[in-house]
Amino acid sequence: MGNWLLPEGLADVLPAEARRIEELRRELLDLYRTYGFELVAPPLVEYIDSLLSGMGGDLNLYTCKLIDQLSGRTLGVRADMTTQVSRIDAHLLNRNSVTRLCYCGTVLHARPADLLSSRELLQIGAEIYGHVGFEADLEILQLVLETVAIAGVSRPRLDLSHPGVVKALFDADPAAAAISGRIIMLLREKDVAGLAELAGVEPALRADTLAALGALVRLYGEIDVIDRARQELPALPALVLALDELERLARAVPDVALGLDLADVGGYGYHSGVTFELYAQGWHDALVRGGRYDDVGRAFGRARPATGFSLDLRKLAAGLSPAEPGRAIRAPWGQDPALVGAVRALRHTGEIVVQVLPGHEHDQDEFVCDRELVLQDGAWTVKTL
């Protein structure tokens, strides 16, 4: 095996792709700032108990672990930045007002999420803390849609769900709550037969709970799913509230293709309100994920209402058209003060000036040099090639 080979699921980012990723990073962080989001930068590595606080067990499987040489405690390389940002809000900033935070940094997965996914992601996201209402959820959704619009993603589709629907069924039926893990697995797999078999193996389950679980796997589609759910599911107060929250948010974003799936329980145990995933042609999986998660900060001693989203910038860039080569000005190498001053002045205006090193006058691959800095009538002048 060659020493230059990288581990499975990891890859170098070459100049054209790196340029596209960096352009997106700058544009998106600038966008988030216009909404009032403050940039934070948590560390790449933390103690494992802090890093996984308030998160589901799935994140533990994705977290690379190592031993701290100074303390002997177990460290984790972050696989997601959301918990870290929640820690900053709850423990370090300790504000009582609404706080908007954004972030961008590398995360590492111990294993890829699927056969086509990378183990190293450049995660960017935004979170609103301190407001439990619809308004914060809508602001996050609007920011998601503006994010993909700026990136050039065409015809996105937004899929909404709400874990409160399933939680209401569990709260109303202790027998269902006792086997919640098994039911969640069956709902994730849309296993209609498996759900039907519960009647024979779990006699304590209420009939209306079994009927509701069977209905959930069929309750997907457009916004009319809400009306069907009101007819087919029991009118439990918490369940009705979840449907109301889902419908209000869905109707607030009429200009995007929308889908609802009431059996989508991917964030169960972590999310506490409306959840969403954004899909688009050219990406095999969800491009953006997010939702409400009000209880994560409790692990840091201060539970705050929270809602937000994140995406992988490298994944986003990979599905976009390649970046155009940069336009540059070619200049000779030299120590003439007038030349040095002319080059510096051009660079200060934002121009790319590539000084050609001796013997490499015809070597230029990365940039398209459409202009040249030449000495004309005793002055350095830019001429079009």
From Swiss-Prot:
User: Where's it mainly located?
Assistant: cytoplasm
The family database entries (InterPro entries) matched by this protein are listed as:
aa-tRNA-synth_II/BPL/LPL (IPR045864), HisRS-like_core (IPR041715), HisRS/HisZ (IPR004516), HisZ (IPR004517)
- Pfam families found in the cross-reference section: tRNA-synt_His
Instruction: Describe its partners and assembly state.
Output: Heteromultimer composed of HisG and HisZ subunits.
**Does the keyword Cytoplasm feature in the UniProt annotation?**
yes
Q: Which Gene3D superfamilies match?
A: Bira Bifunctional Protein, Domain 2 (3.30.930.10)
Superkingdom classification of source: Bacteria
Q: In which pathway does it act?
A: Amino-acid biosynthesis; L-histidine biosynthesis; L-histidine from 5-phospho-alpha-D-ribose 1-diphosphate: step 1/9
One GO CC term, this protein: cytoplasm
The function of this protein is: Required for the first step of histidine biosynthesis. May allow the feedback regulation of ATP phosphoribosyltransferase activity by histidine.
Q: Which residues cross the membrane?
A: none
Signal as a keyword of this entry, yes or no, is no
Q: Which GO terms describe its molecular function?
A: histidine-tRNA ligase activity
NCBIfam families xrefs: PRK12292.1-1, PRK12421.1
Residues in coiled coil: none
**GO:BP terms for this protein?**
histidyl-tRNA aminoacylation; L-histidine biosynthetic process
Q: What is this protein called?
A: ATP phosphoribosyltransferase regulatory subunit
The further comment given in this record reads: This function is generally fulfilled by the C-terminal part of HisG, which is missing in some bacteria such as this one.
The record's similarity note reads: Belongs to the class-II aminoacyl-tRNA synthetase family. HisZ subfamily.
Listed as disulfide-bonded, the cysteine pairs are none
**Keywords, A to Z?**
Amino-acid biosynthesis, Cytoplasm, Histidine biosynthesis
Where in the cell? Cytoplasm
